[in-house]
């Protein structure tokens, strides 16, 4: 396993990935989150997406063994146009994905609410290295999830500097 940044490790540990979980990762980037999540799956699966071709390529290279084993599918697509192949998800993971606090995202949140199982969750994590942005991130992302039918709570870590906005279904 390649080096996993502390912020990603903290977020994935917080999600408490179970071996049978079905997850969606939004914005897989270099694949660190996907690698760590897949290392915890047995019968579960991860569907990872990114709008960036380079992000998808990096994740595919980094996680080739998990793709071959059938635990990971990676696609270049935007959440707004996604048709999730998994009927039901236990968890949705996103790290530093600005969609949920910088623009209107009711359609995307509705899609997630439709796909996340009762008791499941949407886990939006952000580096909180810019403290002046954190209150706005929390307020806007929380509002997006609440308006979409999720029960929201916030978690905060000082080391690593991460804030999480968690929406439970």
How would you describe each model-predicted region?
Residues 1-12:
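Conserved SAM-binding loop and adjacent beta-strand
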Residues 30-42:
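Conserved SAM-binding loop of SAM-dependent methyltransferases across substrates and taxa
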Residues 52:
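Conserved SAM/SAH-binding beta-strand->alpha-helix loop
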Residues 59-60:
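Conserved SAM-binding loop
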Residues 80-92:
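A short acidic, Gly/Pro-enriched loop at the edge of an enzyme's catalytic core
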Residues 90-104:
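A short SAM/SAH-binding and catalytic strip from SAM-dependent methyltransferases
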Residues 106-118:
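A short glycine-rich, Lys/Arg-flanked "PGG" loop and its adjoining helix->strand segment in the class I
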Residues 119-127:
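Conserved beta-strand signature within the Rossmann-like core of class I S-adenosyl-L-methionine
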